[in-house]
Amino acid sequence: MTVGRAINCAKLCNTAVNPPVKPLVFANFLAPDMTPTYADVAARVGRALGVPAQLIEGSGWEQLRDGSVDVAFLCGLPYVRLVGERPGMLRPLVAPVLDDARCRDQPVYFSDVIVRRDSPFRSFGELRGRSWAYNEPGSFSGCLLVRHHLLQLGETEAFFGRLTFTGRHQESIRQVRTGEVDASAVDSQVLGVERLRDPALAGELRVIESLGPSTIPLVVATAAVRNDAQLRVRAALCELGSDPVSRNVLASGLIRRFTPIDDRAYDDIRQKLAIVESAVPSG
């Protein structure tokens, strides 16, 4: 009985001396179809670092501003906006290299313009006056890049007929697939993952044009994470590509590996954002 009490006391003492380790909180601010892949990635990084890790769905940029999230999977457009608002609040860690021959082993992706396979459209120019689905205004591949493309053609959004905002790439894909809209531009990674999960999709949709390449959405650390921990997270993410089991996990998200990335890589998005914003009439 005395021994039992001593063991319990030791456990209590150990708990007091070694308080529970704070979990490493990852958040997915990208398409929900990437959540299973990124949840597994987060768990593997946690195991590599010897800390508990969890993935949550990102619900608002305040999570990045206040540091309630440690690491985030984030689109390049909100990234450049947020660091423009407060330099240093986010640190680029890595970006995925996709298993897509068009990407040429670089951290880039495309905005694929999709239509139904049985539609008559063969090029972006043939979509004049047709119904179009944007993702949402904060999406680079699903909105801003299309607006930039229209400007390069000397056009405005009046080029399209009816415009809708779907709120996510998967919904844009669904609406094109069902014929609710004629066309949309979607993240090439999301489209690739949807094709992996639903092979019938490839027979129902066609890509008539690809905008890009553009620097791909990235993984960032918030200011809540110490510099040494940021470096360890970056290294753990990069090492996933050298482990056969982890490579299978990455493949479910069409990812070949993660590679280090820096802020300058997103200058292409900054430039396109500046062009689009300068074209918006003031007042």
State what each model feature region is.
Residues 144-147, 151-156, 165-177, 202-204, ...:
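Hydrophobic, well-ordered secondary-structure segments
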Residues 28, 94-103, 107-110, 199-235, ...:
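Periplasmic-binding protein-like
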Residues 9, 21-28, 32-40, 228-283:
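An extracytoplasmic/periplasmic, membrane-proximal ligand-sensing/linker region
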Residues 73-87, 152, 177, 182-202:
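A ligand-binding cleft/hinge motif common to bilobed small-molecule-binding domains
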Residues 65-125:
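Acidic, polar ligand-binding/catalytic clefts
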Residues 60-65, 78-79, 171-175, 181:
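Short, hydrophobic alpha-helical packing/hinge segments within bilobed ligand-binding/sensory domains
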Residues 1-20:
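N-terminal amphipathic/basic-hydrophobic helices that include classical n-h-c signal peptides
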Residues 23-48, 58, 76-77, 105-172, ...:
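Bilobed "Venus flytrap"/periplasmic-binding protein-like clamshell domains
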